[in-house]
Amino acid sequence: MPTIKQLIRNARQPIRNVTKSPALGGCPQRRGTCTRVYTITPKKPNSALRKVARVRLTSGFEITAYIPGIGHNSQEHSVVLVRGGRVKDLPGVRYHIVRGTLDAVGVKDRQQGRSKYGVKKPK
């Protein structure tokens, strides 16, 4: 516990909140161009080949973004929309690609939870 004299000399510093998605720069989403599309393996105890893309954002950042859903058409030079949101079992992946916008098409034959994968209501 500091003394009154110490507090007069040095005021208390407010706790700065650290953003979990710095590359978005306070925006809800950012547009970017895929520079590489590849798969990586999750950390223990999970096992899979998770689809990710290296994306150069309009803010100038180069980030790794997860491609959600089954199957995708993303390739190098695809223009994608990126939102925040980490993938718990992929270290360093703090962003998601938004399906159904720009060059990322929605998930094929999706019936439930369609809004998260950019799928229109079936006729």
Swiss-Prot record:
GO terms for biological process: translation. GO terms for cellular component: chloroplast; ribosome; small ribosomal subunit. It holds the Pfam family Ribosom_S12_S23. The keyword Ribonucleoprotein applies. CDD domains: Ribosomal_S12 (cd03368). Its main location: plastid. Keywords: Chloroplast, Plastid, Ribonucleoprotein, Ribosomal protein, RNA-binding, rRNA-binding. It is found in: Plastid, Chloroplast. InterPro entries: NA-bd_OB-fold, Ribosomal_uS12, Ribosomal_uS12_bac. GO terms for molecular function: rRNA binding; structural constituent of ribosome. It comes from the Eukaryota. NCBIfam families: rpsL_bact. PANTHER family: 30S RIBOSOMAL PROTEIN S12 FAMILY MEMBER (PTHR11652). With S4 and S5 plays an important role in translational accuracy. Located at the interface of the 30S and 50S subunits. Part of the 30S ribosomal subunit. Belongs to the universal ribosomal protein uS12 family. HAMAP family: Ribosomal_uS12_B. This is Small ribosomal subunit protein uS12cz/uS12cy. It comes from Gossypium hirsutum. The lineage of its organism: Eukaryota, Viridiplantae, Streptophyta, Embryophyta, Tracheophyta.
